[in-house]
Amino acid sequence: MISIVLGMHRSGTSTVAGILHLNKVIMGTYQSFWPRPLPQNPKGFYENYDFRIINDRLLNKVGYDAKSYESEIPEPLVSDKIKNAMVKIVQKYDTKYEHWGWKDPRTCLTISQWVTIFTELNLIHKLKIIFVTRRAIAVARSLKTRNDLPLEKGMALWKTYTERGLSFCEQNDFPTFYMSFEGILQSPEDHCEKMFDFLETNFDPTIVKHFVDKKISTSGTGEDAEIPNDISDLEFKIEKLLAVK
């Protein structure tokens, strides 16, 4: 099985990827996990740099730098050279691991290109999506703390990543599990039990209990900004998806 974690930066994707990896859903290796744990993610990012590099190449090909934090993002393009790299990394992990996946927020922008590779390699039947979300204002506050990004710019970026990820999920019929970072922090074991039921694999509740730090999020309160109507509408749409279990 291939489990891909989709979600905006600062939305809890590292927490979900860490829980998966510690429960034997291989999200990478020590060598490929980068960056190493930092103050904003003391338990690690569980971000597979091999996939992140390819995502950056896909975006750079159309002139976009993810670290610009601009919310106008072109559709990625795949060159033959990048396609070969994508095929190679997918085959490497799928040959070595029975249940694997990866997490990189940029995949919200590149997931369609990866699915093309899975289709060509006859691996599409293995794919499951875990979509992780968090309130736009909380993400924006976190980005302001980490990157000194204005709240309005952070919310605009949240909207682009979230819309692109959701649009992919809606336009395809891949098994998809929706979960929120707020929900994970409130009742981690309950939410993770549902996630592993979706994945049809066992998990260790004690790992979840010790891994999830309910105090890790400090951006639930803080500076406020007016929430644009389109973002409110998108959050309402997500709430309805979260309610379906």
Task: Please tell me what each predicted stretch does.
Residues 1, 88-92, 151, 166-170, ...:
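PAPS-dependent sulfotransferases, especially Golgi type II membrane carbohydrate sulfotransferases
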Residues 1-83, 211-220:
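PAPS-dependent sulfotransferase catalytic core
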Residues 7-10, 105-106, 136, 183-185:
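Short, flexible loop/turn elements at secondary-structure junctions
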Residues 80-94, 112, 123-126, 133-203:
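PAPS-dependent sulfotransferase catalytic domain
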Residues 97-104:
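Short N-terminal targeting/anchoring amphipathic segment
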Residues 99, 128-130:
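Structural motif
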Residues 110-120:
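Distinct, well-ordered alpha-helical segments
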